[in-house]
From Swiss-Prot:
Function: Catalyzes the NADPH-dependent reduction of L-glutamate 5-phosphate into L-glutamate 5-semialdehyde and phosphate. The product spontaneously undergoes cyclization to form 1-pyrroline-5-carboxylate.
Catalytic activity: L-glutamate 5-semialdehyde + phosphate + NADP(+) = L-glutamyl 5-phosphate + NADPH + H(+)
Gene Ontology process terms (BP): L-proline biosynthetic process
Keywords: Amino-acid biosynthesis, Cytoplasm, NADP, Oxidoreductase, Proline biosynthesis
Name by which UniProt lists this protein: Gamma-glutamyl phosphate reductase
Species, as recorded: Pseudomonas aeruginosa (strain ATCC 15692 / DSM 22644 / CIP 104116 / JCM 14847 / LMG 12228 / 1C / PRS 101 / PAO1)
Compartment(s) where it occurs, according to its Swiss-Prot or TrEMBL record: Cytoplasm
GO cellular component entries: cytoplasm
GO MF, any single term: NADP binding
Amino acid sequence: MTESVLDYMSRLGRDARAASRLLARAATAQKNRALLAAADALDAARAELSHANEQDLAAGRANGLEPAMLDRLALTPARIDDMIEGLRQVATLPDPIGEIRDMRYVPSGIQIGKMRVPLGVVGIIYESRPNVTIDAASLCLKSGNATILRGGSEAIHSNQAIARCIQQGLAEAGLPAAAVQVVETTDRAAVGALISMPEYVDVIVPRGGKGLIERISREAKVPVIKHLDGICHVYIDVAADLDKAIRVADNAKTQRYAPCNTMETLLVHAGIAERVLPPLATIYREKGVELRGDAATRALLGADVLEATEEDWRTEYNAPILSIRIVDGLDAAIEHINTYGSQHTDAIITENFSDARRFLAEVDSASVMVNASTRFADGFEYGLGAEIGISTDKLHARGPVGLEGLTSEKYVVFGDGHVRT
């Protein structure tokens, strides 16, 4: 790690810490002005954004980036529209900062409650997608947090162009420029520095591949909000409605293959397998989904179903591949999910209320669903407006992390000259 990178990151950290104190007391209207002005700046800078993005795409093609990575990197006109709309949408969301709840009198006569406050400085580390710059900056700004954004080197020109628009919005609203800072060096040492500055950074949110997140979780000296895998399950109970089961299991797998809330393993009660699996298998085959199953599944569906290995149950495919297991009942389904799952999102399809309640209580995941597709595990679908990511951790934020997940609470106490006796 070079001294210059350390000095540079320390300067960003100091400036962010100072800006966070100003942001914490900024009025809602002022934060909204910054968001709306940034949206207007993006709209006016479409040509500049496209030019910067083409620089990144050209470099990516020259460096042999895979087509999927190039697709994530591209800022199409539609994606620029989405970024602009995203800023304007966040401006309409309720501001959680300063909200006081649970006010109550205690026997001593003092009144106690909790006030929602920003976390302080949020470090975001992400890969490829320039639109994350807008998502992260807008949510952090609205929740009163300063943010330091370290995007992937492959998107450096795009991120810098987006940052200039955000800076314009901050300036027009009279907010400090250091409220949103983009790391402008591609030196990987910047990541190590960012995750090792607890004096300046309060939390890190990594968004990227498993290797990146594992490294940050292992090395960070700052709390991390993260999820490693999206190994999501749908369990079709013996008391499932057949039409609901087929509709949900189809959507959970085939609506999109890459997102982290896509089903990777289908569990089916043995008592309903013969009725539900053949029609589902037909749908999957027509859509080009490769099926892998246990012995019972292969015996039922035919030789074109590949043998599922132990590794399959632990794999997030992000592809048209599905593992299927026939289980004896609810106990076996819950045991499988808690053994092989990633604590992300899991669903049961059933008309049995007690089975549904048991599933909700005993499956140890951030989102647990009844008769609904795992694809709903998303900040927008949950009514959060937007999300900065999904957390499978249990401390602080869990599930889709929106504005409230970027805040904390402090106790507020009112008295009238009260003293403790």
